[in-house]
Amino acid sequence: MLSEIWRYPVKSMRGHQLTEATVEPWGLAGDRRWMVTDADGSFLTARELPRLLLGVPTPGADNGLRLHADGLGDLVVPAPGADARERTVQIWSSSVRARDAGDDAAAWVAELVGADVRLVWLADPTQRPPNPAFARTDDRVSLADGYPLLVTTEASLEALGGGFSMRRFRPNLVVTGSKAWAEDDWRVVRVGGPGGAVFRAVKGCPRCVMTTRDPDTAEGGREPVTTLARLRRFDGATWFGTNLVPDTPGAVVREGDVVEVLEEVEPGAGPLR
């Protein structure tokens, strides 16, 4: 069963739990269409700027945002129009064209994180393909790290022990009722029964220092990476969750939906990699 749905309007800022969401070809509607960059257009995340986690973006009308953080005044940021400054921005090995949100938005985020930054909006989410070694050439992803959605399971979180919050792993979909690490073996899943949303499971998710940042305080530590290194180390990386690509854009997923595994492989090989 689908127990949680999460959307992250601004890459590396706080997420919002939803009761339902529309699936688009590049991810959930409104997920990671905004991003923080340096002055040269290179993407920045809470890996480098942990205080990004303390920003609370609330989606508004016409793709706009309201930005909030304790100690800072709220700021309403309209989605930049066609006449806004367009910039080439870099996210990992991809370059895309995005619209700059202006100096007020940049100043607000700069005050939050203590660095010279810009805030940009991806007006055209059809520009960026995922890694073709794992996805199809016509698949697309917005400003998520690599793939449109991430699914995790409550059983796998419980298997880690330690009382870790699922929020550290920043999933889009959380599933309950499976066995621990069952998501390693999924290849096609459907959410919502016949006529529901169908996803391809294309690659496991290697985890980084982001998971060691407390999502409420931005304080760093060694967990859960230390535990993952003990329990979930494959090919020199630590893994938790599985990346998904939508095959039924326009479908709606809802909290409480049935989750069916339509195709899977024999267990034992670990995450798809």
Locations of regions flagged by a protein language model:
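Metal-cofactor-dependent catalytic cores
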Residues: M1-R273
